[in-house]
Amino acid sequence: MTTFPTARDVRTTPEGLLWEPSERWVRGRKGDVTVVDSRHPVLVWEPDVPVPLYAFPRADVREDLLRPAKNPATGTHTGSRIFYDLEVDGELVENAAWTFPAADLAGHIAFAWFRRWGTGLDHWYEEEEEIFVHPRDPHKRVDAMAGSRHVRVEIDGTVVADTHRPVLLFETGLPTRYYIPREDVRLDLFEATDHHTDCPYKGTAEYWSTGGHANILWSYPDPLPAVAAVKGLLAFFNEAVDITVDGERLERPVTPFTGTVE
């Protein structure tokens, strides 16, 4: 009889890693070559890194494509890990994979998704969905809800958006984002840029700038199904603009984006 945990089933290793088994079918490809094909992956959280990565049983990895790393990665979190280069069709990918020293994770090989070391694989899939940037954290929620609050946005004292029909996006660990219909935004004050970002929970965003404020406004033209309600709507970085909701001025939050936008 299989027992399923009713709370977060996370284990800790001596080096401070958190990990838990996953039941998702995960595959990773380099070009047309499947390097990883696993129905028994393990999610791993490194110290002070907010997003997880996957480690896989050796039997689920094409170890014949791995070589001892010529220039092993050094720095934060590398510790006593053993790094491997990946060689596929004559192309060498440095530090594409590694093993952990922790006994709990012995027999597993991890691959980088967010490319701190090496260049990683080209495509990752959970079940039949392609996943970008990093694995989705099963303990994180993202909800998009239609609202009727009065939301006003100011930049340098100028009102750039005013709406009574926002969509509120609630994402674990981040401030509420207010997505506003285009008709309620002074888009004439903004200029589209070629900047794009990818999010494993929401999709690919496009950006606009105004004055000395680069990429301060964004939209998801084709969001993932879970947040379809924000399609085509516009949102601002709370960290860099003044937002008033139902007459109450919100404090600018401190987040990982603080300082990256102005």
Description of each model-found segment:
Residues 1-262:
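Terminal leader/tail segments of proteins
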